[in-house]
């Protein structure tokens, strides 16, 4: 057997439930990790706010799939996991900058000023990383459009939207909250 695709309603439901369990399990581990790593800047609340941003990202990727009428399949799971990885990486960069600035400036800055300064310091890095990745995904979109390969487009289009939403949520949702 070289390849098999089972597309009945039962297998679709099973696939969705397995994906949901995998994402929920990763969310729990993520909150625990952030709670320990960033104890000085809020710990558990930092983990919960990072999770809020990630749920936002998952919803946005899902919305793109629905809007474009793409099937919820393995591409969906790949896009969600990739966007979550990118988004949490950007969030951790912001949190790390907040922690470093807290150590550097102590209590001389208000929390609002500290977060604002930290986001300002990390925005260029986050945007540049996202733009670089988005250009690579855009190149894939162009080549797929020219060659008529639609299967990869169901990955590339939601991926671009997810990258943009993930960067937004890292800078504008998880940090300020």
Positions of predicted regions on the chain:
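A structural signal for conserved, well-ordered secondary-structure elements
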Residues: 1-177
């Amino acid at each position: 057997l070289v390849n098999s695709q089972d597309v009945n309603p039962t297998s679709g439901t099973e696939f969705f439930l397995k994906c949901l369990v995998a994402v929920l399990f990763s969310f729990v581990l993520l909150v625990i990790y952030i709670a320990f790593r960033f104890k000085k800047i809020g710990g558990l609340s930092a983990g919960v706010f990072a999770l809020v941003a990630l749920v936002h990202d998952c919803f946005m990727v899902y919305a793109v799939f629905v809007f474009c009428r793409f099937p919820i399949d393995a591409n969906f799971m790949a896009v969600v996991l990739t966007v979550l990885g990118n988004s949490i990486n950007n969030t951790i960069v912001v949190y790390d900058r907040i922690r470093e600035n807290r150590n550097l400036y102590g209590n001389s800055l208000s929390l609002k000023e500290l977060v604002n300064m930290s986001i300002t310091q990390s925005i260029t890095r986050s945007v540049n990383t996202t733009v670089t990745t988005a250009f690579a995904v855009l190149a894939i979109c162009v080549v797929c459009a020219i060659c008529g390969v639609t299967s990869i487009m169901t990955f590339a289009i939601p991926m671009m939207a997810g990258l943009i939403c993930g960067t937004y949520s890292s800078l504008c949702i998880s940090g300020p909250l």
